[in-house]
UniProtKB/Swiss-Prot annotation:
Designated name of the protein: 3-isopropylmalate dehydratase large subunit
Gene3D superfamilies noted in UniProt: Aconitase, domain 3 (3.30.499.10)
Pathway: Amino-acid biosynthesis; L-leucine biosynthesis; L-leucine from 3-methyl-2-oxobutanoate: step 2/4
Entry binding sites for [4Fe-4S] cluster: C349, C409, C412
InterPro entries (alphabetical): 3-IsopropMal_deHydase_lsu, Acnase/IPM_dHydase_lsu_aba_1/3, Acoase/IPM_deHydtase_lsu_aba, Aconitase_4Fe-4S_BS, Aconitase_4Fe-4S_dom, IPM_dehydratase_rel_enz, IPMI_cat
The record's free-text note on cofactor binding: Binds 1 [4Fe-4S] cluster per subunit.
Quaternary structure note: Heterodimer of LeuC and LeuD.
Name of the encoding gene: leuC
GO MF terms held by the record: 3-isopropylmalate dehydratase activity; 4 iron, 4 sulfur cluster binding; metal ion binding
EC number(s) recorded for this UniProt protein: 4.2.1.33
Function as written in the Swiss-Prot or TrEMBL entry: Catalyzes the isomerization between 2-isopropylmalate and 3-isopropylmalate, via the formation of 2-isopropylmaleate.
Cofactor(s) of this protein: [4Fe-4S] cluster
Family affiliation: Belongs to the aconitase/IPM isomerase family. LeuC type 1 subfamily.
Keywords: 4Fe-4S, Amino-acid biosynthesis, Branched-chain amino acid biosynthesis, Iron, Iron-sulfur, Leucine biosynthesis, Lyase, Metal-binding
Length: 475
């Protein structure tokens, strides 16, 4: 009888092609997602050595990082470097015969939203992409993580990856979340507790009642930020919600193949008695709506708190806090709810799905953004955008004073026209608040979609619970 195994153990074991004496493994890769920034050199490497893509049917390409989110982008991209990268992806996808969703295709969007949406991401798979937030796909019980450009070329050429196994970490969220608290608050709270290095060397399995109660969109948000906690990947065991989400999607199995897949997927859970190397437990009812105050995702506090002082920290974190406060232009003791906001960004692979837009629209319905507020919603894919328009969400955003954009990574990172100006302060539903992440000297506060919508209305960081069920302004 075999020893009890974790979910990570099972997926890993099913994909090991060869193991060396030192523990280094050759791992088979089921899905390879590609975007325009980390792939040009990899494809050029294939050309120089006369190699083909080994499994073009398992390789999916989408331009997302560099693409503008305004009309006319399918014919003209002003930034030369961005244009060259998008054109290179277009040529490489066609030359090598891989699956491709160009900007002119309604299915185009952020690669980590397109993969699940199209049924490319399935439970039990290994999924890689030259992108940090590949862990998103772990919400399906897939082993998914980012890889470097040289590894992108290796996977394109061989459909395998050289890896050493990580350790097992369990993050359990017990009980239920309170009203106004979301998946984004879970994942930020975990990072706030463990720090950005807390998951280093581990693959995290998220579990517990609060995780089970999340939708698939919410689970993707949680796994998306596993990398921000230092982990190699984040996983959630598949269940009936997972199967219902996948069923009927364009590239999901059909007929007898579906039944066979389902039988396998139902074995993908951590066995009773399986050992984890590290365990973190948080009570769901203790999690509040949170916001980041500094320049690291671990700089997290409940919205009801005040800006900390450097003296509140120890060791090297004292100087880091001092630098963060200076960069962010904040004063110790200042209420977080007194921090004025210039810009609101709702979107990204963390919070650009239909559920995220619904949550923001619920807060914004019948209201207007604060005077002088710059606010934009960037759906995670063309299909999310179309659905939001069909549901009337787009009109709510437009009526409130938001810009309604085309799909892309947008203001999550300063690689396209959507950027902050120096000193501009943004409430953002994205995943990183590093210095300059959204534009040179821009200031980022990470929040949930509802919290972002609340800040747009009031003009400052706001507890979304104060606006929930609040009456709309008279017409």
């Amino acid at each position: 009888m075999t020893a009890p195994r974790t979910l990570y153990d099972k997926i890993w074991d099913d994909h090991v092609v060869h193991q060396s004496e030192d523990g280094t493994c050759l791992l088979y890769i089921d899905r390879h997602l590609v975007h325009e920034v980390t792939s040009p050199q990899a494809f050029e490497g294939l050309r120089m050595t006369g190699r083909k893509v080994r499994a073009p049917e398992k390789t999916i390409a989408v331009p997302d990082h560099n693409v503008p989110t305004t009309e006319g982008r399918d014919t003209k991209i002003d930034n030369e470097e961005s244009r060259i990268q998008v054109e290179a992806l277009d040529k490489n996808a066609r030359d090598f015969g891989i699956n491709y969703y160009p900007v002119s295709d309604i299915r185009q969007g952020i690669v980590h939203i397109v993969g699940p949406e199209q049924g490319w991401t399935l439970p039990g798979m290994t999924v890689v992409c030259g992108d940090s937030h590949t862990a998103t796909h772990g919400a399906f019980g897939a082993l998914a993580h980012g890889i470097g450009t040289s590894e992108v070329e290796h996977v394109l050429a061989t459909q395998t990856l050289i890896q050493k196994k990580s350790k097992n970490m369990k993050v359990e969220i017990t009980g239920s979340l309170r009203p106004g608290v979301t998946a984004k608050d879970i994942t930020l709270s975990v990072i706030g507790l463990t720090g950005t290095a807390g998951g280093t060397g581990y693959v995290i399995e998220y579990c517990g009642q609060a995780i089970r109660e999340l939708s698939m969109e919410g689970r993707m948000t949680v796994c998306n930020m596993a990398i921000e906690g230092g982990a190699r990947a984040g996983l959630i065991a598949p269940d009936e919600k997972t199967f219902a989400y996948v069923m009927g999607r364009p590239h999901a199995p059909k007929g007898a193949a579906w039944e066979a897949a389902l039988a396998y997927w139902k074995t993908l859970f951590t066995d009773e008695g399986a050992q984890f190397d590290k365990v973190v437990t948080i009570r769901g009812e203790d999690i509040a709506p949170v916001v980041t105050w500094g320049t690291s995702p671990e700089d997290v506090l409940p919205i009801t708190a005040t800006v900390p002082a450097p003296e509140d920290f120890t060791g090297g974190k004292v100087e880091a806090a001092r630098r963060s406060l200076e960069y962010m232009g904040l004063t110790p003791g200042q209420k977080l709810t007194d921090i004025k906001i210039d810009t609101v960004f709702i979107g990204s692979c963390t919070n650009g799905r239909i559920e995220d837009l619904r949550a923001a629209a619920e807060i914004l319905k019948g209201k207007k953004v604060a005077p002088g507020m710059r606010a934009m919603v960037v759906p995670g894919s063309g299909l999310v955008r179309a659905q939001a328009e069909e549901e009337g969400l787009a009109q709510i955003f437009i009526d409130a004073g938001f810009e309604w954009r085309l799909a892309g990574c947008s203001m999550c990172l300063a690689m396209n026209p959507d950027q902050l100006s120096p000193g501009e302060r943004c409430a953002s539903t994205s995943n990183r608040n590093f210095e300059g992440r959204q534009g040179r000297n821009g200031r980022t506060h990470l929040v949930s979609p509802g919290m972002a919508a609340a800040a747009a209305i009031t003009g400052h960081l706001t507890d979304v619970r104060d606006l929930m069920m609040a009456p709309a302004e008279p017409a």
